[in-house]
Regions:
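An N-terminal, well-structured beta->alpha segment
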Residues: 1-86
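Ferredoxin-reductase
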Residues: 58-141
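Short, intrinsically disordered, charge-balanced linker/junction segments flanking boundaries
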Residues: 143-146
Length: 146
């Protein structure tokens, strides 16, 4: 099931979706091809799982950003809508959504956020034919267990 805010902020859509069986997080999150993340509801499905498992989502603060690769702005928009639908009170995003993993970890701790979502596939090449990743850090600024 995925919850996301619609164009009308008072309306929330709930979709029952079959799980994506290849969404098994690795060391720091989910890393797949950009094309996989472009499948309908693929990103939303993983982010839904994140919001259902991170403690303190309702009323909490989330840090969000990434390395600026292909797909980052779309992902940021999706995650922002879902964050609103899940009742987060604040999402901290830098200009253009550009945020390194160490900077995200620091912001999470300094702003006492519930965690952060970092959009990066690290050293893997980006682009439409490259890779995309969603890392999840907890309130301590470090990776959440997979």
């Amino acid at each position: 099931m995925t919850a996301s805010a619609s164009a009308n902020p008072a309306q929330i859509f709930v979709r029952l979706e079959a799980p994506f069986t290849d969404q098994k997080p690795g060391t720091s999150g989910l890393r797949k091809s950009s094309r996989q993340f472009e499948q309908p509801h693929y990103l939303e499905s993983f982010v839904e799982a994140v919001f259902r498992t991170l403690p303190g989502v309702q009323g909490g603060t989330l840090v969000l950003g990434g390395d600026g690769r292909y797909g980052n702005l779309r992902a940021i928009n999706v995650i922002l809508r879902m964050a609103a639908a899940h009742g987060l009170s604040k999402v901290i995003i830098t200009t253009g959504g550009i945020l390194s993993t160490p900077a995200a970890s620091n912001l999470i701790r300094k702003r006492k956020a519930i965690g952060g979502i970092i959009l990066s596939a690290s050293h893997n090449p980006g682009g439409p034919d490259g890779d995309f990743g969603v890392k999840v850090n907890g309130a301590n600024g470090g990776p959440t267990p997979g």
